[in-house]
Amino acid sequence: MGSTGKIKIGINGFGRIGRLVARVALTRDDIELVGVNDPFISTDYMSYMFKYDSVHGKWKHHEVNVKDSKTLLFGEKSVAVFGCRNPEEIPWGEVGAEYVVESTGVFTDKEKASAHLKAGAKKVVISAPSKDAPMFVVGVNEHQYKSDVNIVSNASCTTNCLAPLAKVINDKFGIVEGLMTTVHSITATQKTVDGPSNKDWRGGRGAGFNIIPSSTGAAKAVGKVLPALNGKLTGMAFRVPTPDVSVVDLTVRLEKSATYDEIKAAIKAESEGNLKGILGYTEDAVVSTDFIGDSRSSIFDAQAGIALSDNFVKLVSWYDNEWGYSSRVVDLIVHMAATQ
């Protein structure tokens, strides 16, 4: 905690998630953004990219100005700007950044992310799945966080959508096995026109005019945050030409028989109780753009799901894969700070 009583955070990587985490942080009273690092973006360009957003609209909360080449002003609040390629060299200690959001997509394992600790940070939250850092999904397993753990992963946006839904269903009815499909909006790694993508040939095809089948580790990752479901879920993705908001289709076999109405009631109860603000519930005739700017991780679409029998059901849940996820990154930091 800083002298202001606020949690001081830094952001490494000012891409989609980095900028939106900054937006979330700057609208909250319990967080203070003290520094941003990105070696590829100048300070004046940073200001422009923060201010104007094709999906989430122009920033309306306060003026954003460049004080000098190393400082941005958000209203009266000055934020230090760095351009270090090596995270070890970012002066987090000097600006007092206790928690660093690692959102470059590059330093996603414990060894690489630990460079921020050497630079003076106390904790690191990786805004991506990690092969070896413990993964936490707020609303699902964040209570298992121990204060001596310094590097954590906030999992993926899709895992954050799927896990709360899977938790409710497994707790109430038991999941024998399940398959997930996410119909997922385009992301920065995709191509505007056909281009080279050696690891994933389909992923190199033009994002704006194709439905592109893709792999995702999101369903398997649920088994890491909910060990009871380990080995019971897997899934895949279709990348589609929408700029933001995605939707999970979870098809599961249940241990206990349940009508679709009983399943809806269980999800609705949790959305108003333990998972309020994380899991949503709607019976409206919604479409994807209705969820742009929705800060919840997962919004269950009661009308869209369907049961084949009392043991076999398809469940549909929406998520703003940018804004909802960025909101959870900040929530996880607040939770971690509360356990210190």
Curated annotation (Swiss-Prot):
Q: Which SMART domains match?
A: Gp_dh_N
Please indicate which residues carry the site annotation Activates thiol group during catalysis. 184
Q: Does the keyword Transmembrane apply?
A: no
Task: Quickly give the catalysed reaction.
Answer: D-glyceraldehyde 3-phosphate + phosphate + NAD(+) = (2R)-3-phospho-glyceroyl phosphate + NADH + H(+)
Q: Which residues are listed for D-glyceraldehyde 3-phosphate binding in this entry?
A: 156-158, 187, 216-217, 239
Which InterPro entries does this one have?
GlycerAld/Erythrose_P_DH, GlycerAld_3-P_DH_AS, GlycerAld_3-P_DH_cat, GlycerAld_3-P_DH_NAD(P)-bd, Glyceraldehyde-3-P_DH_1, NAD(P)-bd_dom_sf
Q: Which GO terms describe its cellular component?
A: cytosol
| Binding residues for NAD(+) | 16-17, 38, 85, 321
Where this protein primarily resides, as one coarse class?
cytoplasm
Q: What is its EC number?
A: 1.2.1.12
This protein's pathway:
Carbohydrate degradation; glycolysis; pyruvate from D-glyceraldehyde 3-phosphate: step 1/5
Subcellular localization is given as: Cytoplasm
Q: Which UniProt keywords apply?
A: Cytoplasm, Glycolysis, NAD, Oxidoreductase
Task: Report the Pfam families cross-referenced here.
Answer: Gp_dh_C (PF02800), Gp_dh_N (PF00044)
Please give the SUPFAM superfamilies that the UniProt record associates with this protein: Glyceraldehyde-3-phosphate dehydrogenase-like, C-terminal domain, NAD(P)-binding Rossmann-fold domains
A GO molecular function held by the record: NADP binding
The UniProt entry's GO biological process terms, in alphabetical order, are:
glucose metabolic process; glycolytic process
User: Catalytic positions?
Assistant: 157 (nucleophile)
UniProt keyword Transmembrane present: no
Q: List the disulfide bonds.
A: none
Q: What does this protein do?
A: Key enzyme in glycolysis that catalyzes the first step of the pathway by converting D-glyceraldehyde 3-phosphate (G3P) into 3-phospho-D-glyceroyl phosphate. Essential for the maintenance of cellular ATP levels and carbohydrate metabolism.
Which family is it part of?
Answer: Belongs to the glyceraldehyde-3-phosphate dehydrogenase family.
| NCBIfam families (UniProt xref) | GAPDH-I
How is the quaternary structure described? Homotetramer.
| Other comment | Plants contain two types of GAPDH: cytosolic forms which participate in glycolysis and chloroplast forms which participate in photosynthesis. All the forms are encoded by distinct genes.
| Protein name per its UniProtKB record | Glyceraldehyde-3-phosphate dehydrogenase, cytosolic
Organism, scientific name: Pinus sylvestris (Scotch pine)
